[in-house]
């Protein structure tokens, strides 16, 4: 699926513009409109982010998070990636499952 079936392209562009210099997942989730989406739509977004279909979003996929929204977006740096993981990985297994993702978006 495509991310634009769930999110508005204008909102995505605004959210990406805010991430140019630094990434804050909460700001991104709110600006992109993710926080208002149903669990079913969040699961769709999760499936897009889970590029290797492992059922989890791992560190390498978090690093490329923004590129799921725009191919030309930057990679997250190590500090941003680690903070993003820490925010979502409530069971501390080093990756983010779909329920953890939904909880992080709605937090």
UniProtKB/Swiss-Prot annotation:
Residues 37-72, 76-107 form the EF-hand domain. It comes from the Eukaryota. The keyword Transmembrane does not apply. Stable between pH 3-11. Homodimerization increases with increasing pH. Thermostable up to 240 min at 100 degrees Celsius. As the heating time increases, homodimers increase while monomers decrease gradually. Melting temperature (Tm) is 79.2 degrees Celsius. Reversable thermal denaturation. GO terms for molecular function: calcium ion binding. PROSITE patterns: EF_HAND_1 (PS00018), EF_HAND_2 (PS50222). GO terms for cellular component: cytoplasm. Expressed in muscle (at protein level). Ca(2+) 1 binds at residues 50, 52, 54, 56, 58, 61. Ca(2+) 2 binds at residues 89, 91, 93, 95, 100. InterPro entries: EF-hand-dom_pair (IPR011992), EF_Hand_1_Ca_BS (IPR018247), EF_hand_dom (IPR002048), Parvalbumin (IPR008080). Keywords: Allergen, Calcium, Disulfide bond, Metal-binding, Muscle protein, Repeat. Belongs to the parvalbumin family. Monomer. Homodimer; disulfide-linked. This is Parvalbumin beta. It comes from Mustelus griseus.
């Amino acid at each position: 699926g495509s991310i634009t079936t769930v999110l508005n392209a204008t909102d995505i562009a605004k959210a990406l513009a805010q991430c140019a210099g630094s990434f804050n997942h909460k700001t991104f989730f709110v600006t992109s409109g993710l926080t208002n989406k149903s669990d079913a739509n969040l699961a769709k977004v999760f499936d897009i982010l889970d590029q290797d279909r492992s059922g989890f979003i791992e560190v390498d996929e978090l690093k490329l998070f923004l590129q799921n929204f725009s191919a030309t977006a930057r990679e997250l740096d190590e500090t941003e990636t680690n903070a993003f993981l820490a925010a979502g990985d409530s069971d501390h297994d080093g990756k983010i499952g779909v329920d953890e993702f939904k909880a992080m978006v709605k937090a």
